[in-house]
Amino acid sequence: MFVRTYAGAIVGIDAAAVTVEVNIAGGGLGMYLVGLPDSAVKESEQRIRAAFENSGERMSGRKVVVSLAPADLRKEGASFDLPIAVGILAAMSRVDAETLAGTMFAGELSLDRGNSVSYTHLTLPTRISV
């Protein structure tokens, strides 16, 4: 299933909207992040998987493709954890995708069942600029 959520990225002193597209399909394993993510964004996979597993949610046996657009904009930091996780939950039909329409997310997930979301440096600039 395909789902779209939104995030933000810092560009100089401004922020830009980032579209987070999540597609989950059978027949394959792993999470694939595309769209110029830095190493902290790539590490989102590990934080998201740990939070899901610790909350009893399973992603195993599924191929998850996450596209961060626009592809030419560098995405940095852990603030993409929350929009990716919410997109995955919606693609798994655990969250109603229609209720996410036009909503922007930012936050770093804790490993403790996903019950903690940390404030990120991106929250205020994104709120002001986008």
Spans of model-derived segments:
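Gly/Pro- and small hydrophobic-enriched strand-loop and loop-to-helix capping segments
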Residues: 130
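Peripheral, non-AAA+ core regions of ATP-driven protein-machinery
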Residues: 1-122, 127
